[in-house]
Design a protein with these regions (language model features):
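Flexible, glycine-rich terminal cap/loop adjacent to redox cofactors
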Residues: 1-116
Length: 116
């Protein structure tokens, strides 16, 4: 079973607050590293404020989620934006790319998945 880790608000909490927001989701199925590990279940999700891009929440369901969430905890602690995560170099192919890709997807700029 995949691990689950999160920090910050859920999408439901942000929606209930009335604050405009955007989300980016990256499925681990699109991660070469996750597929090689036979751990392609789950996703990484970034929730950011629409107006100033501040990260409001990050949710990871997938391989090593408990390890991967540390970057998101730091991002929230320092009021980072999804663009801050987008500009951070993530090695390829790694599981940590999932957070990078989810941040890119929030602005419809994902590299390894479909932009919706």
């Amino acid at each position: 079973a995949p691990e689950i880790a999160w920090v910050g608000q859920t999408e439901e909490q942000v929606k209930a607050s009335g604050r405009p927001y955007k989300t980016g989701v990256f499925p681990f199925l699109a991660s070469g590293r996750a597929r090689a590990m036979e751990g392609a279940q789950g996703f990484a999700k970034v929730i950011a404020a629409q107006n100033d891009d501040e990260i409001l929440g990050v949710h990871i369901i997938g391989p090593l989620a408990g390890e991967l969430i540390a970057e998101a905890v730091l991002a929230l602690e320092y009021s980072a934006s999804s663009e801050d995560l987008q500009r951070t170099i993530h090695a390829h192919p790694t599981l940590s790319e999932a957070l990078h890709e989810a941040a890119l997807a929030a602005d419809k700029r994902a590299i390894d998945s479909i932009n919706r």
